[in-house]
Amino acid sequence: MIAGIGIDVAEIDRIKRAVEKTPSFINKVLTKGEQAQLATLKNQRYYEYIAGRFSLKEAYSKALGTGIGRHVSFLDVEIIDNELGQPVVVSHPFDGPAHASVSHTGQLVFTEVILEKGE
């Protein structure tokens, strides 16, 4: 049974500017595991990854119904790409499965997260 659905869109250039202006942005948004994956990426893919994780975590918080803030932070959710490149939610506060999807254009990242609960 679906417990929540969240979607989000992020501008890659906006995230790139945030990282360039405040390099600690990465530490506020990405877990150590996500930062390890990020370290393997270069050029545009580097910023797509950061924007994607930012947007996925926003979508997750919307699916949870709380938004980012008091009840869930960016670092409470870890999303790691599997060997096929699929984003997998490996750590999160919701008691049930979480499914994530991300898509990129040259300028935008679109994300969706679905939370499931048992019946």
Swiss-Prot record:
Name of the protein in question: Holo-[acyl-carrier-protein] synthase
CC terms in the record's Gene Ontology section: cytosol
Binding site for Mg(2+): 8, 58
Cofactor requirements of the protein: Mg(2+)
GO function terms (MF aspect): holo-[acyl-carrier-protein] synthase activity; magnesium ion binding
GO biological process, one term: fatty acid biosynthetic process
EC number(s) reported in the record: 2.7.8.7
Family per similarity comment: Belongs to the P-Pant transferase superfamily. AcpS family.
Role noted for this protein: Transfers the 4'-phosphopantetheine moiety from coenzyme A to a Ser of acyl-carrier-protein.
Catalytic reaction(s) noted: apo-[ACP] + CoA = holo-[ACP] + adenosine 3',5'-bisphosphate + H(+)
Any Pfam family the entry gives: ACPS
Major localization listed first in the record, in broad terms: cytoplasm
InterPro entries referenced in this protein's UniProt entry, alphabetically: 4-PPantetheinyl_Trfase_dom, 4-PPantetheinyl_Trfase_dom_sf, ACPS, P-Pant_transferase_sf, Ppantetheine-prot_Trfase_dom
Keywords: Cytoplasm, Fatty acid biosynthesis, Fatty acid metabolism, Lipid biosynthesis, Lipid metabolism, Magnesium, Metal-binding, Transferase
Subcellular localization(s) per the UniProt record: Cytoplasm
Domain of life: Bacteria
